[in-house]
């Protein structure tokens, strides 16, 4: 029996949730997650649907759910027994999250590390402490770990994980539509919460420079992402722009409208200082939209030759000049669009699922 641990899946839309919805449907294994009543359930793969779980009705379980501690509120051995299964039948446990099932340390487990951002660009001391003091236990319990980039793999090694236990499996994407053939205007899009690692001040510096030195820019930068620790700073920077009306702060958009905004934008921007992968950049490339991104290791790892890079901590002049070049030079826009689309074609979800399946199969054979 193979178990897929989904106890850390939170309600609503998130990057982690999107990862589950892309990957888990292609994997064999009984799904372990919270049911409508806030209790653990085991769902056969043929009966499972990739819908986010609800918030648990009880206050205690909802608290555990919020902090990815659900396993500590469940009697997992009893749940296994009530479903007619024995611990000895568990061949392997796979988690698309950075969580092992700590009650079963003797069962081979494969867990996924998407990033270690809380250790280097944390938004709270609580998150830093959780990663520094609690995540090492999950790493020790896991038999193997998936890192979604070589950058994350290197971070895991620095975190104390044996490099022989790490497998790098990058995110994949499905190309569902023909790429955009030409820019529809000069609008820009950034998908970023108001968190420290998203480095939104760099975008405001770039737009400020663009407005001052290229006043004919007629577009709008839309920053889509929920508020966070940096919201007061973001609001101050917004108001201080020469033309604040050219930047819109949007908490969220329905999926269809977000896609429409992306495809109608001249480019997607990402100024992050710390990421495990930065999936929105790949999403933009799958639509044929050029990307202008910060010069950080994980961006270089995947996007060298198919994106334009700007410093994360300069005065904004490089980003501004790149945007001017993109507006003026249609051939540059076309080059970035085509090279980005080619990168997206090379990173498929099917290949990602196949690599994960190999790792799960290897665990099953070792038990």
Question: Which functions belong to the PLM regions below?
Answer:
Residues 1-367:
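Carbohydrate transferase catalytic cores enriched for Leloir-type hexosyltransferases
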